[in-house]
């Protein structure tokens, strides 16, 4: 359920950076069922402009189901999502489907994100910032998994979003590519003051990037800064493979 309710919270600092007084999104008591099976149980959190939140959890723990609620794909939930204003939300799904029967260049895919939106963000600046100029004339089907993720990130950026939701964005990358991707995310947030919510099942790769980590296994088990999370007894009991 959408609400335009304004939320009043004190100014705080996250990762040493001054954050907006008001969160741009507040998730309040979200519960979701698939049939009789509860996949999300009473999840609540908020995010401010310029903040990076990682939703960490095991496979099958409800991460993807939660982000599908946040971006409006799944609307059959209990609870409320509050916005201080109606935001532009860009979504990067975990599995991008490439249709081999409809060839598409990288440039065409990026331009398609601009059509009918009146977007003012300079497409060329985004292409240079994400460093995909050399990929523009190539077919999407020819790209590696890591290259596709960079292109999809650029596509999100040209929408001039307030919030980008990334579902397991680095699951197909090696360690070096993961680190480079997370560094790029941090730079984009600093430059454009956008908010990021991303899912992962690997804490170690998000340590240098996230302001906050929310550990979920249907319900929220613990949350805090990456440093606080790794010291949490609840985290170690639920996600021992990440310790």
From Swiss-Prot:
Part of the ABC transporter complex ZnuABC involved in zinc import. Responsible for energy coupling to the transport system. ATP binds at residues 57-64. GO terms for molecular function: ABC-type zinc transporter activity; ATP binding; ATP hydrolysis activity. Residues 25-242 form the ABC transporter domain. The complex is composed of two ATP-binding proteins (ZnuC), two transmembrane proteins (ZnuB) and a solute-binding protein (ZnuA). Its EC number is 7.2.2.20. It comes from the Bacteria. The gene is znuC. Gene3D superfamilies: P-loop containing nucleotide triphosphate hydrolases (3.40.50.300). It is found in: Cell inner membrane. Belongs to the ABC transporter superfamily. Zinc importer (TC 3.A.1.15.5) family. This is Zinc import ATP-binding protein ZnuC. Keywords: ATP-binding, Cell inner membrane, Cell membrane, Ion transport, Membrane, Nucleotide-binding, Translocase, Transport, Zinc, Zinc transport. It is a peripheral membrane protein. GO terms for cellular component: plasma membrane. It catalyses: Zn(2+)(out) + ATP(in) + H2O(in) = Zn(2+)(in) + ADP(in) + phosphate(in) + H(+)(in).
